Design a protein with these regions (language model features):
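C-terminal interaction appendages of subunits in large macromolecular complexes
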Residues: 16, 22, 28-31, 35-276
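P-loop NTPase nucleotide-binding/switch module
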Residues: 1-18
Length: 276
């Protein structure tokens, strides 16, 4: 569907066709009156592979993939529908008995928010740390220094329990379908997207085929027009109607060589050839 542009001088589509499931690849989050949506990001290659599986009639199975890395429990994912839940953990390794390194932080958090949660837990007495440092460069790296005698293993458990080293995410796969909200699992969304991609590719090929057929049709007309010297008698016709009638008659004997019916537009283009 086409709508008027902001100044009314042009037309613009009310929506742009999408061949790739960008919603699932990047994830999205939004809120409206009485409803909300939350889509987790997914792996590009997996989306392509599962789209191919759908088109081949195979089962579609895939899970979110977080750019930050980390560990996740998807046992309650339920295809991203309402009520589903995903637990995401950072990775923590013990450098020595006094030092912990937090890396690959949970999706939806930042190093700043995670450090703040650790400091709050320390202030409340949930954990005991000596110092915390942010050594993040290209990848997240937070250094936690412990007091002597503090168990690093128990501290790791406490970090998961009382800080943003572990977070719970509640996906909500809600989309707008035909101007109405609809709850649809991510696997179903991928199937619809794959089918839409096939339809769009077919439409593009049909449009391109029509363009090529038009070019072929006119090049055939042009060849017949010039080779049979139809332009020589143009000066005998004083108006466009009689000229077109003459050309229609001349082309009628070549009907079998033409790909489609001749139109007035075709004849107009022929009469604009510079040699006339």
């Amino acid at each position: 569907n086409w709508l008027s542009s902001y100044d009314g001088r042009n037309k613009e589509p009310d929506q742009l066709p999408m061949k790739f499931p960008l919603l699932l690849a990047q994830g999205a989050e939004g809120i409206a009156v009485g409803m909300a949506c939350k889509f987790l990001p997914h792996n590009f290659i997996e989306l392509i592979d599962q789209s191919i599986n759908h088109l081949r009639g195979k089962k579609v199975e895939f899970l979110p993939d977080f750019p930050n890395g980390g560990m996740a429990d998807f046992s309650g994912y339920n295809d991203g529908l309402r009520g589903s839940r995903v637990r995401v953990r950072a990775k923590i390794k013990k450098l020595d008995n006094k030092t912990l390194i937090i890396y690959e932080i949970p999706f939806g958090t930042t190093t700043g928010s995670l450090i703040e949660s650790v400091i709050k837990a320390n202030d409340k007495g949930k954990i005991k740390i000596k110092k915390i440092e942010d050594n993040t460069s290209m990848e997240a790296e937070i250094i936690v220094h412990l007091f002597p005698g503090v168990s690093p293993d128990k501290t790791i458990d406490a970090l998961y329990a009382f800080t943003d080293c572990e977070v719970s995410i509640s996906p909500n796969s809600t989309i707008i379908d035909g101007d109405k909200p609809r709850f649809m699992g991510v696997s179903e969304i991928l199937k619809v997207t794959a089918d839409t991609t096939v339809r769009l590719l077919k439409l593009e090929l049909e449009i391109r085929l029509d363009e090529l057929e038009r070019m072929w049709h006119f090049s055939t007309l042009e060849k017949l027009f010039i080779n049979n010297e139809m332009y020589i008698d143009f000066k005998l016709y004083s108006d466009k109607e009689t000229l077109y009638e003459y050309l229609y008659k001349r082309f009628s004997v070549f009907k079998k060589e033409l790909l489609r019916e001749i139109t007035d537009e075709d004849l107009h283009k022929l009469t604009q050839i510079p040699m006339i």
